[in-house]
Design a protein with these regions (language model features):
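N-terminal donor/sugar-recognition subdomains of glycan-related enzymes
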Residues: 1-74, 83-87, 212-246
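Glycine-rich anion-binding loop/nest that anchors nucleotide
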Residues: 76-81, 100, 181-185, 193, ...
């Protein structure tokens, strides 16, 4: 179900957006073995799922890709978004990609392409998922219980969300993707760029270096601020550092 393949083991917009994942693991003392286990378990769970099979997920990815490439502007919402900041982001051609709980800042879902999440976004993520919104579910070593509980709940909804699966390991896992990045926010940027959206058509709002955003969901403030340093590096290396509040 998974194999080493340096030529196809990631789809990150730049090699470093992928390679930095090893640096993050080393910095926090995390094991790639745990990340692999979580990703493979998620893949196996959904292999023959009636709503989220590999073929259905591929169709979802193609639909989101088409939506993003057709947008005049793709706005990525970070957890520090203030609702009044959205006033200037309501043009007909605007499409949103929300980082986890930041989806709660949106007044509705009509312009939402997807939510990129490792599933700690709490009530706002759950509300969107239970209304059939698309979620790019990320597996890592510390969220097995979260994704298991979330998917168990969502599959019982009258209109379950559509899913795309991502991981952060140095291996190919069939039916999953490594788009690069680390936090939900910078991974959302990596996701959008990896699908071929031109950088000039992408804007970030609600990205902060020194503030744990109100939409962050379940988090430990001290750890989150450390993670934001990595977010800043990834976003800056991709050429979007000027969007980060400092």
């Amino acid at each position: 179900m998974h194999e080493s393949n340096p030529q196809s083991m990631h789809e990150a917009p730049t090699p470093n957006a992928f390679l930095i994942q090893d640096e993050v693991r080393q910095a926090f003392g995390w094991s790639e073995v745990d990340d692999i286990e979580s990703a493979v378990d998620l893949q196996l769970l959904l292999e023959h799922h009636p709503h989220w099979s590999p073929l259905q997920r591929e169709h979802t990815l193609q639909r989101v890709e088409k939506q993003l490439l057709g947008a005049q502007r793709v706005i990525i919402l970070g957890a520090a978004i203030e609702e009044n900041e959205l006033v200037s982001y309501n043009r007909p051609g605007d499409i949103f990609v929300a980082a986890d709980g930041a989806v709660g800042a949106l007044p509705g879902y009509s312009q939402l392409a997807c939510i990129v999440s490792d599933l700690d976004g709490g009530e706002f993520l759950n509300a969107a998922a239970k209304q059939g919104q698309t979620v790019v579910v990320h597996a890592h070593g510390d969220n097995k219980q979260r994704w298991a509980e979330s998917l168990s709940s969502w599959q019982q909804c009258p209109q379950p969300p559509s899913l795309i699966l991502s991981h952060q390991v140095n291996q190919t896992i069939l039916g999953m993707h490594n788009f690069g990045g680390f936090t939900d926010g910078d991974r959302a940027l990596c996701f959008v760029l990896s699908l071929g959206v031109h950088p000039k058509n992408v804007e970030l709002v609600g990205f902060s270096l020194n503030q744990v955003g109100q939409w962050s969901g379940i988090t430990i403030a001290e750890t989150k601020l450390k993670k934001l340093k990595w977010m800043e590096r990834i976003v800056s290396e991709l050429g979007f550092g000027h969007f980060i509040k400092k």
